[in-house]
Curated annotation (Swiss-Prot):
Pfam families recorded: Peptidase_C15
Native source organism of the sequence: Mus musculus (Mouse)
Statement: the UniProt record of this protein carries the keyword GTP-binding: no
Protein name: Pyroglutamyl-peptidase 1-like protein
Record keywords: Hydrolase, Protease, Thiol protease
EC number(s) per entry: 3.4.19.-
Location of the active site: 11, 73, 92
Matching PANTHER family: PROTEASE FAMILY C15 PYROGLUTAMYL-PEPTIDASE I-RELATED, PYROGLUTAMYL-PEPTIDASE 1-LIKE PROTEIN
Example of a GO MF term: cysteine-type peptidase activity
Source species taxonomy: Eukaryota, Metazoa, Chordata, Craniata, Vertebrata
Record carries keyword Hydrolase: yes
One annotated GO biological process: proteolysis
Family: Belongs to the peptidase C15 family.
Amino acid sequence: MDSSAKAIFLEQCGKNRGYRDSDVRGFQPEDGVCLPGGPEVRLSVVNMKEVCRRVAVENVEVAFSRDAGRYICDYTYYLSLPLGTGHAALIHVPPLSHWLSASLLGKALRVIIQEMLEEIGKVQTQSTAA
């Protein structure tokens, strides 16, 4: 994540293509593809936009994103989503700073994760009612 970021980003999806940079050990997906033949986009069942709408933590911006970048985070997210049948989340956090202490970040993450769990509960309730 960009070290100048000033918000926590909740990522809705992982993408299969566009991986151009190598990781710190030199690994780069062949042809820039995470999973040959895989779907272009995989979505989390957690409605991150709704979670963002409901989360409020003192002076911490929480933002919705559909682009985790084409690097290790997005690659890992894309591959993890089917393992939990979509019950996965990627939270990009900014570095600790004068405006974001470890304590405040911890508080924000607790609130965000609680909202995500509530959102998953809604999805499960809707699927059993159908």
